[in-house]
């Protein structure tokens, strides 16, 4: 009863989630003075072969059944199928030309479907994103905006509706129209009484409504309309934070929709479907799942902005362009470690724990000779293919440090220990855990058990010499950072960066693993 009274007395919140439509593709279209809604365009790096993942697909290409993040060869195959069908309908089964504009293609069936493959320009997309964020700032204070990604934001509009004498829908439309007028990029928006509902309104409901003439879609949800519209919605993976693993586990227990989860949460103790079942499956995360099943989300914008994690980490990962053998992949791991330690020095952070994960290539099992030799565990990857189980390990350092020398030695030892020398490698991830500010690290007291057999005079001298070496290394790292910031990341390269199979030189010219 008290909970219901509290909800009644609490001011109704209004949250807006805005997602820029096919952002990367839209930017590339506008830079070519083309309409993002009618131009067939994919953003992908063709130099990486047709297996490369497309970063974005324009809306007109999606109309042919192409998903949002396909491999480039999937786009090629789909358009080939579309053109085969169009050819049969064309006069004399012959194309008279080609076009990458959906308006022209719809008007003339004798045209072959064409499309533009635009190489990614991540730095340029970041500039566009910053420009659009500044448009939001014309209407909303920064403390009420949470950038969720490069093309998506959450906005707490509660205190602005009275100021502007607008509804949440009108305010959302005003901001989207301003973005469209300034940049030519349209958007989809969701409005909800909490952050979860506005996200779901945008991700699920808005995508099933008809857009206006500018391609804008806006949907609204509150707790009750969420239950009416989406309790029977499938698949579960359409919902925020429900991945394939969650969905599979729920379906194995007879729960196929959010309505099923909600009903399970109020089941009686003597029934199979009850709250305890959810906690057995997901532990404390079941609390969040149950809240979301009912359309509740207690976390506010203020809490999101104030959140500070208990522990911090820095992660670096890459998918190799082709399978690497043990030695070539070890070189890449060494490069990645080197760059990570420079990043730690730049941020004045130190670590005492490194985690390494190495994923193996599918060729290890498709090649008959390699398959016969492999006796280890086999898992299924995200594409449903059999691959050797990945290698995963952790190494703890004796001290908190950002030293390239100490961390690299530890990572190389870990790599040799956990990685199968006979397997081809495709993915590498390195994480530095338990990060703290280097100034705090120096203040930490350390203790040591003394014994009668150690010459502590010699030991202190060795420690002093090690500190001197680490101090020289630190100055060298800082000098390298200064030069790289002034003249570019490739202004200074090490010998290993020029060896066959090295990737650091190319990655220095990328942002997020894609061309800058």
Describe each PLM feature range.
Residues 1-516:
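Basic, low-complexity intrinsically disordered segments
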């Amino acid at each position: 009863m008290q909970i219901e009274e509290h909800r009644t007395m609490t001011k109704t919140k209004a949250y807006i989630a805005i997602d820029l439509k096919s952002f990367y593709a839209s930017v590339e279209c506008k830079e070519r003075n083309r309409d993002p809604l009618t131009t067939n365009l994919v953003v992908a790096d063709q130099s990486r072969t047709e297996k490369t993942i497309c970063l974005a697909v324009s809306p007109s290409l999606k109309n042919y059944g192409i998903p949002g993040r396909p491999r480039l060869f999937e786009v090629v195959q789909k358009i080939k199928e579309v053109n085969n069908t169009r050819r049969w309908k064309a006069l004399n089964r012959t194309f008279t030309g080609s076009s990458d504009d959906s308006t022209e293609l719809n008007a003339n069936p004798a045209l072959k479907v064409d499309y533009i493959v635009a190489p990614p320009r991540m730095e340029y997309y970041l500039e566009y994103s910053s420009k659009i964020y500044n448009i939001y700032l014309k209407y909303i204070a920064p403390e009420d905006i949470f950038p969720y990604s490069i093309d998506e934001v959450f906005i707490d509009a509660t205190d602005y509706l009275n100021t502007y004498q607008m509804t949440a829908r009108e305010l959302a439309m005003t901001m989207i129209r301003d973005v469209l007028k300034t940049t030519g990029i349209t958007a989809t928006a969701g409005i909800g009484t909490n952050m979860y509902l506005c996200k779901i309104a945008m991700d699920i409901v808005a995508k099933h409504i008809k857009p206006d003439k500018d391609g804008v879609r806006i949907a609204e949800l509150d707790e009750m309309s969420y239950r009416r519209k989406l309790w029977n919605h499938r698949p579960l993976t359409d919902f925020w934070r429900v991945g394939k693993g969650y969905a599979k586990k729920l379906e194995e227990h007879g729960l196929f929709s959010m309505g099923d989860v909600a009903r399970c949460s109020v089941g009686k103790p003597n029934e199979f479907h009850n709250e305890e079942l959810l906690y057995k499956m997901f532990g404390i995360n079941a609390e969040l799942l149950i809240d979301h099943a009912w359309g509740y989300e207690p976390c506010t914008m203020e809490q999101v902005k104030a959140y500070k994690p208990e522990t911090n980490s820095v992660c670096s990962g890459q998918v190799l362009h082709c399978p690497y053998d043990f030695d070539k992949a070890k070189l890449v791991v060494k490069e990645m470690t080197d760059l990570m330690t420079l990043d730690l020095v730049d941020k004045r952070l130190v670590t005492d724990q490194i985690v390494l994960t190495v994923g193996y290539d599918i060729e290890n099992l498709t090649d008959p000779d390699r398959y016969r030799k492999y006796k280890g565990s086999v898992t299924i990857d995200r594409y449903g293919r059999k691959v050797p189980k990945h290698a995963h390990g952790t190494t703890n350092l004796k001290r908190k440090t950002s030293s390239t020398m100490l961390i690299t030695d530890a990572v190389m030892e870990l790599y040799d220990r956990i990685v199968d020398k006979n397997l081809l490698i495709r993915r590498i991830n390195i994480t530095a855990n338990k990060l703290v500010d280097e100034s705090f690290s120096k203040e930490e007291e350390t203790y040591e058990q003394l014994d009668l057999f150690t010459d502590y005079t010699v030991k202190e001298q060795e420690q002093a010499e090690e500190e001197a070496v680490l101090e020289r290394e630190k100055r060298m790292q800082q000098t390298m950072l200064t030069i790289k910031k002034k003249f570019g990341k490739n202004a200074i390269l090490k010998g290993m960066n020029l060896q066959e199979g090295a990737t650091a030189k190319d990655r220095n010219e990328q942002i997020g693993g894609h061309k800058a």
